[in-house]
UniProtKB/Swiss-Prot annotation:
Keywords: Aminoacyl-tRNA synthetase, ATP-binding, Cytoplasm, Ligase, Nucleotide-binding, Protein biosynthesis. This is Arginine--tRNA ligase. Belongs to the class-I aminoacyl-tRNA synthetase family. One of its GO terms (cellular component) is cytoplasm. It comes from Haemophilus influenzae (strain ATCC 51907 / DSM 11121 / KW20 / Rd).
Length: 577
């Protein structure tokens, strides 16, 4: 149940009845201060200006046409023409009870779409590093959220499984006569890659064989395809281990690597040339885009085929967009990659649209993100300046969480302690990233992310277990609790009830904008509001049984909302800490 959306629709209709045009926007916002209501309509003044009317007079006309008596107990015109909306406590109690009895906390699927989410996308024959973390966990949180909202989500792990380097790798695999390639650890494969590159650079006979294998691989040679498949399988098995540790929902079935689009590339380039979009320049095929200018102010050229006949990432991304619309029948395609890819993606998609491969109704969205930085403000590296392997980062998270939990609590069984350590350690790394606006860079700081204070995973996980402990102290029957009447009299009860009913607003924003930090901020605010409620409104020691049950209902919905919200983020909860 999205209060903001309901109010927006109703007030927009009243604005239209009062004379505004169909494109008007009520601009409903949550109010920052209780004296200004629970919500404000901020679009009255802009609409009044278009009509040449006094904003306060137009606001009164809107109120005269507004039917909100069931939702709002009071409406008032404030300042130059704002409308302050005070929600009706009776309506709040009805909606809270409905959310408690609904499997998705009152959130119902609307406008179901098929959405492709392209995320993670590591390279074959290389181990995942910290540079893959953001795409993997942000994309996964958005995928989980869109599924929760009722959409059909297709995960696309666009792995780098094609290119000239595979000739070199196949040649070296053959040279080593390694018949047990599928058993190789990826750490060995990293060294294997370096050795293959060294041979390629230093041994011309080897390099010639490697180049020959590239041609054979691209032409479908069975031997080369088998060797290539081994390299892909080794890599994906190791990546799957990282995904499991990160509690990420990607599976091997979600792999849609660059090689998937290879059969499409020649015909796409031929068609671009036929349409006059691609022209020859020094043997290469280039698309010139007026929408992008080079440093001389001329239309920027985007190469779609090199003069040696090879294709580029742009060509593959055009094919991917076409495939996702035509074959996967998607309504939206979201790509999670870093900001440095923004121009590349916009150019590929502009060519896709110019060629008529997808209609305007098909939404192509680059959900770009900033970099993970060290405390020195530079890209996050090892002490020696090397790339940090993702597995090593997760190992350190577990080590630090082990120290932290051992200091905090010795009243847990070994199994309980192990579960808490994993949830806190991995959760801390994920939440520290997800809680930041994805478009900005952020500083990776172990001390901050493992703190039990502030907007962190440990704080959120503890907030959840704290509420669980309330229910562990009572033997109340869940059926009886759901049937008990809910009353909202205290201001703290009211504030908590409203925040609980704003869950869908946060979730819908994540689904629309691809911004998990909005959900993190919501959950942090909810935990803080519950803490204040808990301090001021006795629950188990309430003055009478009816108030106790009513407050337990608010506590139960808070518990469910925190758990559901953290689940959407891919953060595990525990029953005891």
């Amino acid at each position: 149940m999205n209060i903001q959306s309901i109010l927006s629709d109703k007030i927009k209709q009243a604005m239209i009845l009062a004379g505004a045009d169909q494109s008007c926007d009520a601009l409903i916002r949550q109010s920052g201060k209780p004296q200004f209501g629970d919500y404000q309509a901020n679009g009255i003044m802009a609409a009044a200006k278009k009509l040449g009317l006094n904003p306060r007079e137009f606001a009164q006309k809107v109120l005269d046409n507004l039917q909100l008596s069931d939702i709002a107990e009071k409406l008032e015109i404030a300042g130059p023409g704002f409308i302050n909306i005070f929600l009706n406590p009776t309506w709040l109690t009805t909606e809270i009870s409905a959310a408690l009895s609904h499997k998705n906390l009152g959130i119902q699927a609307t406008n179901k779409q098929t959405v492709v989410i392209d995320y993670s996308s590591p390279n074959v024959a290389k181990e995942m590093h910290v540079g893959h973390l953001r795409s993997t966990i942000i994309g996964d949180a958005v995928a989980r959220t869109l599924e929760f909202l009722g959409h059909n989500v297709i995960r696309a792990n666009h792995v780098g499984d094609w290119g000239t380097q595979f000739g070199m790798l196949i040649a070296y695999l053959e040279k080593m006569q390694n018949e047990h390639a599928s058993e190789m650890e990826l750490q060995d494969l990293e060294a294997f890659y370096r050795e293959a590159k060294k041979h390629y650079d230093e041994d011309e006979v080897f390099a010639e064989k490697a180049r020959n294998y590239v041609v054979k691989l691209q032409s479908g040679d069975e031997y080369c395809r088998t060797m290539w498949k081994r390299l892909v399988d080794i890599t994906m098995q190791q990546n799957q281990h990282n995904y499991a540790r990160l509690n990420v929902t990607l599976t091997e079935k979600d792999v849609m690597g660059e090689s998937l689009y290879n059969p499409m590339l020649p015909s796409i380039v031929k068609d671009l040339k036929k349409q006059g979009l691609a022209v020859e320049n020094d043997g290469a095929l280039v698309v010139y885009l007026d929408e992008f200018k080079n440093k001389d102010g001329d239309p920027m050229g985007v190469i779609v085929q090199k003069k040696d006949g090879g294709f580029l990432y742009t060509t593959t991304d055009i094919a991917a967009a076409k495939y996702r619309y035509e074959t996967l029948k998607a309504n939206r395609a979201l790509v999670f990659s870093d900001t440095r890819q923004s121009q590349h993606m916009q150019q590929a998609w502009l060519i896709t649209r110019k060629a008529g491969y997808v209609p305007d109704s098909f939404s192509l969205e680059h959900k770009n993100f900033g970099m993970m930085l060290g405390k020195d403000g530079k890209p996050f590296k090892t002490r020696t300046g090397g790339t940090v392997k993702l597995a090593d980062l997760l190992d350190e998270a577990i080590e630090r969480a082990t120290v932290l939990i051992n200091e905090k609590n010795t009243n847990l069984s070994n199994d309980e302690k192990e579960a808490v350590i994993e949830a806190v350690g991995i959760g801390a790394v994920k939440y520290a990233d997800l809680s930041k606006n994805r478009t900005t860079d952020y500083v990776f700081d172990w001390d901050n992310m493992l703190s039990f204070e502030g907007n962190t995973a440990p704080y959120m996980q503890y907030a959840y277990t704290r509420i669980r402990s309330i229910f562990n102290k009572t033997d109340i029957n869940s059926t009886a609790l759901l049937a008990a009447p809910l009353t909202i009299k205290d201001d703290k009860e009211r504030t908590l009830a409203i925040k609980l009913l704003q869950f869908e607003e946060a979730v819908q924003t994540v689904g629309k904008e691809g911004t998990p930090h909005v959900l993190c901020a919501y959950l942090y605010e909810l935990a803080g509001i519950f803490s204040s409620f808990y301090e001021h409104c006795p629950i188990l020691n309430a003055e009478d049984e009816s108030i106790k049950l009513s407050r337990l209902k608010l506590a139960l919905l808070t518990e469910k909302t925190l758990k559901q919200g953290l689940t959407l983020l891919g953060i595990k909860t525990v029953e005891k800490m």
